[in-house]
Amino acid sequence: MSSAPPFAAALAWSGHLRRRLDAHPDLAAWLANACAHPVSANVLAAWQAELSGPDAPEVLPVEQCRGMLRKLRERVFLTLIVRDLGGQADLEEVVGAMTVLADIAVGTAYRSVAAELAAVHGLPREQSTGDPQEMLIVGMGKLGGRELNVSSDIDLVMLYGDEGETDGPRRISNHEFYGRLTRRMMPVLSEVDADGQVFRTDLRLRPDGDAGPLAWSLDALEHYLIGQGREWERYAWLKARLMPAQAFADSNPDAQARQLESLRVPFVYRKYFDFDALAALRALRERIRQDWQRRALARNGVDSANNIKLGDGGIREIEFIVQLSQLIRGGRMPALQRRGLLEALHAERAAGLVPEGDAQKLEAAYRFLRRTEHALQYREDEQTHLLPADPAQRAALAAALGYEPAAFERTLAEHRAFVSQTFRNAFRLAGMGEEDDSPAPARTHANGHAMRPHAGALHDIEERLAGQIQRDFPEHAEDLLRRTETLLGSHRVRSLPDSSRHRLEALLPAALTAATQTSAPMDAALRLFDLIETIAQRSAYLALLAEYPDTLARVARMVAASPWAAQYLTQHPLLLDSLIDWRTLFEPLDFAQVAHQLAADLDACRLPDGEPDIERQMNLMRDVQRQASFQLLAQDLEGELTVEKLADQLSALADLLLAETIRRVWPLVNRRPGAEPHLAVIAYGKLGGKELGYASDLDLVFLFDDDREDAAELYAKLGRRMTSWLSTMTSSGRLYEVDLRLRPDGNAGLLAVSLEAFEQYQRSHAWPWEHQALTRARYAAGDTEAGARFERIRADILVMPRDVQALRGEVLGMRDKISAGHPNRSELFDVKHDRGGMVGVEFVTQYLVLCHAATHRVLVNNLGNIALLRLAGEAGLIPAPLALAAGDAYRTLRRAQHQLRLKGVDKARVPPGQLAAERATVCELWQTVLQDGTIAQAEVK
């Protein structure tokens, strides 16, 4: 037996290693050589070939396969003992080697048994193509996540594509073929003989567990997951991975692999989070807490403190913490859709879901506990997670891991205490509310449907609501009773299943109560009923509002404050669950983080063949835009944002989404490897002036700076695809309406224009109104060099010498056209378009820039109307007091327009006596600057 330094720690701890070296003295030299290199996939492949023999057939006979795999497993296990305990192998090497071993073992056993069966029964074939049909072997749990421990069992689910039968002389159904194949494979892997075993195998994670068939068709799996799939199965399928096993020549399982992934992903990661699922996940957490007790009893009551997997602060709790956020948010954040635990934890940290410090502590705890777990299993090659109770053995374990006993116990206690505390707070950390705010469990009917208080027939709830309405809404009782009758009589409500109807019966009285606590109870009640009717068929949202009273109260306040907000929520109920974590909703938008996470999530939207899933990407961008806008809306309604700050934020969001659109669309149109897009997206209008509203269109111009021969065609195609990407109506709605008419020559012009052509057009062919529009234009997204060149061209155009009188006439003429295009035949004042309104300020500002930018270059900067007026006043171009007063008036007019829009008013108009001082100031500014004698103070309504 060798006692060389690399073996010292391993020999001192592992009785299994000592016995193997005693029984096979020649093994020491081989092991010393093997331990000099990492145990990689290539190393395992070489060992497999060596153990199979130089003349081995491509497919080993079953008995030869059994022996080879057991010897291979022994090599891997012994090498890892020495390398791991000697400090040479990190966690990634250990779990990676065991996972590669499992892939080899399962694939080799499958090929051997399948060949034996096919020799008797023939090949199972696909009905559509006639090609040989493989069995799909799915690795679950740690095998799926490539995280196997060194003495792990493996969880497998066996699937296949088409029903049918084999093509041999003794034909059997495909179903029977795969069932027999599974049954015969298991002993090859798990039966213990003189050489030990390869892996214990567990098939109980298949649908219906031990009561179900050994192999399931994909169609049967789909029906099961849709109709009977439970929350714990979502947890189980999160890591599911199709293993690389192929037995038949000329088979092509790619289509079935894609079908499997198309079933797995939406089952595990739901876009619309089901709040029924939240209760189930809480129950799952309790099961994890109690699981160790059940197993401990089976081991004569071993204290949970010694179980580093199932006990408090153990590995299972870390897995739940990480996977909870994946299950809750992974449907909307594809970057979280990772099988590996550490990969997922890193993604959650990058997404801001787990604080940096907590993520580091969780990873450190996980690595420590997994290494300890492996050391326990190295000792006697047992699947154990129990720390020794004997102090001497405990000290020996610490020494094997490189610790003094006291330091080991201290480190272990610190890690487990942190994990345990984090586990208790898992739902709060996942953004699903405080732990003590969790809803009370629902009572249950005998048929299994959830039952809420006051359950009964619809006419009973109508009677109860009538009494509540007459008491709390006496002045509007008749209208609200009529709306209640309409709601309860609607097809959406009458067709509800029992569970949803019971929830509705609890929700409606609660909604009325919440409405009474708002500033506009009647409006809030009607709008809540509209929202409830819209979401009635989505049980998840009924559950949310029924079981989270604080969230219902927040919704009531929002819809009372703004009918536009009520309509927005009704159109996008996906936003409702963001109201659970109210504090997060009021955090400032971190655009760098939004951009980083969006890019990561879009990168993760892949089809099974690796190509981008464009539909998912487009929907994801729309969902992100809605979520960010809703966050701003919540802050807006609570008075946290000025109109200017809100517009800045909405404009920054649009810039971010434009930049990401270029990145996603460019590879779809460019066929030249490595080429970068030299496109600048120029924002005009509200986006150009950073005055964007919640529902504003984007006025865009596409400019390119690229000398490749096909540039004009390429960038026109890019512009078309970008416009489609932004404005196409998908299942998540439309990102933005896009208006491209401000490009050179308008609708008659090219969709994308070179910078040279743009400059020439602006110098020689542009109308004065196009130069007016240019004052509000800016580079928004795309190639920064092209953007900088545009800004230089813009500045050069704005400082061109102009005939002031001619310009004045053009501006006045364009103002008249604007007025004619927006006639106001009412007695109300149109805040934007009437004389004395916002357009007047904007035209004056544009006129001042075009007249005076040559001598006052500061006016070239796109600073917004208020800042430019102030600069004009400071330069003496207009009276400074008037400049400040006009800026204040413009700010007030914008605020009034914004408030009217939030109230759902289409045209921002107010009574004639309102905003009179602001209108007078704007008219004075107009007369002072443009000397328009036809616009007199007396003409203001």
From Swiss-Prot:
Record keyword Transferase present? yes
One Gene Ontology term of the biological-process aspect is: regulation of glutamine family amino acid metabolic process
**What Gene Ontology molecular-function terms does this entry list?**
[glutamate-ammonia-ligase] adenylyltransferase activity; [glutamine synthetase]-adenylyl-L-tyrosine phosphorylase activity; ATP binding; magnesium ion binding
Query: Gene3D superfamilies from the xrefs?
Result: 1.20.120.1510, Beta Polymerase, domain 2, Nucleotidyltransferases domain 2
- The portions of this protein that span the membrane are none
Cofactor(s) needed by this chain: Mg(2+)
Question: Which Pfam family is one of those matched by this entry?
Answer: GlnE
Q: What is its EC number?
A: 2.7.7.89, 2.7.7.42
Keywords for this protein: ATP-binding, Magnesium, Multifunctional enzyme, Nucleotide-binding, Nucleotidyltransferase, Transferase
Task: For the region Adenylyl removase, give the residue spans.
Answer: 1-431
- Disulfide-bonded cysteine pairs: these are none
Name the PANTHER family on file: BIFUNCTIONAL GLUTAMINE SYNTHETASE ADENYLYLTRANSFERASE_ADENYLYL-REMOVING ENZYME (PTHR30621:SF0), GLUTAMINE SYNTHETASE ADENYLYLTRANSFERASE (PTHR30621)
Q: Which family does it belong to?
A: Belongs to the GlnE family.
Query: What is the name of the protein in this document?
Result: Bifunctional glutamine synthetase adenylyltransferase/adenylyl-removing enzyme
What is the native source organism of this protein? Bordetella pertussis (strain Tohama I / ATCC BAA-589 / NCTC 13251)
Q: Which gene encodes it?
A: glnE
